[in-house]
From Swiss-Prot:
Name of the protein in its database record: Cell division protein FtsB
UniProtKB keywords: Cell cycle, Cell division, Cell inner membrane, Cell membrane, Coiled coil, Membrane, Transmembrane, Transmembrane helix
GO CC terms: cell division site; cell septum; plasma membrane
Major localization listed first in the record, in broad terms: membrane
InterPro entries associated with the record: Cell_div_FtsB (IPR023081), FtsL/DivIC (IPR007060)
GO biological process: FtsZ-dependent cytokinesis
Membrane topology reported for the UniProt record: Single-pass type II membrane protein
Self-association and partners: Part of a complex composed of FtsB, FtsL and FtsQ.
Segments crossing the lipid bilayer: 4-21
Residue ranges the record marks as coiled coil: 31-71
């Protein structure tokens, strides 16, 4: 009876070792689970970005307001008869904001 008990104990130890430390064991499972969670978070961020880009594309395809807004903001374009004014902060405020941005 003693040899059978030792054999079963050895098999149990071997199975536990392979469960915890072997290939596809608990450690591999937790590592893969963490990798999947990180990838899902990245995918969620990218999906939100894609949704935003698709909304912008739809807006640009659908109407003139988005094109006009973009032309005014990025290219400083104006309509005939309009005057474009750009407000530039004075030097002390620019130095303060530059100092805060460098932190």
């Amino acid at each position: 009876m003693g040899k059978l008990t030792l054999l079963l104990l050895a098999i149990l130890v071997w199975l536990q070792y392979s469960l915890w430390f072997g290939k596809n064991g608990i450690h591999d499972y937790t590592r893969v689970n963490n990798d999947v969670a990180a990838q899902q978070a990245t995918n969620a961020k990218l999906k939100a970005r894609n949704d935003q880009l698709f909304a912008e594309i739809d807006d640009l395809n659908g109407g003139q307001e988005a094109l006009e807004e973009r032309a005014r903001n990025e290219l400083s374009m104006t309509r005939p008869g309009e005057t474009f004014y750009r407000l530039v902060p004075d030097a002390s405020k620019r130095a303060q904001s530059a100092g805060q941005n460098n932190r």
